[in-house]
A protein has these predicted regions:
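Juxtadomain coupling helices with adjacent low-complexity linkers
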Residues: 24, 134-157
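Short loop/turn motifs at secondary-structure junctions and domain boundaries
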Residues: 47, 107-112
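Regulatory sensory and allosteric helical modules in signal-transduction proteins
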Residues: 58-108
Length: 157
């Protein structure tokens, strides 16, 4: 059963806390990873109005475009390339205040100015996907985003 997204105004942490609860409720009885990624990307995107919110799935030695919200996207990213590939390789969240300063950044859109990429791992610790969020503003993402997005991605195991 679909739930209506209910995120009222408030600060960033308050929005994330409410978003976390709603995603937890929505995903608790759904076992399909793509369905959960699709709903999570829509909920995150519409709560914060980010430029682009996408999941890339690990397929072999590439990240392959998965559920997303926003403009057209790069379809495939190699292991270790760009912000997404680096998050996968290093198995840790990447917070990039200015994408132009990130060595090897892959410019899917010139509108993207800052980015956060959060790896998603399975029960064995293997990276299965990454959540990539872009903003058209510099310095959009901070430790609050990192902490809450890591918690949200943890719901999708």
């Amino acid at each position: 059963m679909a739930e209506e997204l209910q995120i009222a105004g408030g600060g960033k942490e308050e929005k994330y806390a409410l978003l976390y609860k709603q995603i937890a409720t929505l995903t608790e009885n759904e076992s399909d990873a793509i369905a959960n990624m699709a709903n999570a990307s829509a909920m995150i995107h519409h709560t914060f109005g980010f430029w682009w919110t996408v999941f890339y799935r690990v397929v072999g030695d590439e990240l392959v475009l998965g559920p997303f919200q926003g403009p057209l996207a790069c379809s495939r990213i190699k292991y270790g390339r760009g912000v997404c590939g680096t998050a996968w390789k290093e198995q840790r969240t990447q917070v990039v205040p200015d994408v132009e300063q990130f060595p090897g950044h892959i410019a899917c859109s010139s509108a993207s100015k800052s980015e956060i990429v959060v790896p998603l791992s399975d029960a064995d610790g293997n990276i299965t996907a990454v959540l990539d969020i872009d903003s058209e503003h510099y310095n959009t993402f901070d430790d609050v985003d990192r902490l809450w997005l890591e918690k949200i991605v943890g719901l999708l195991k």
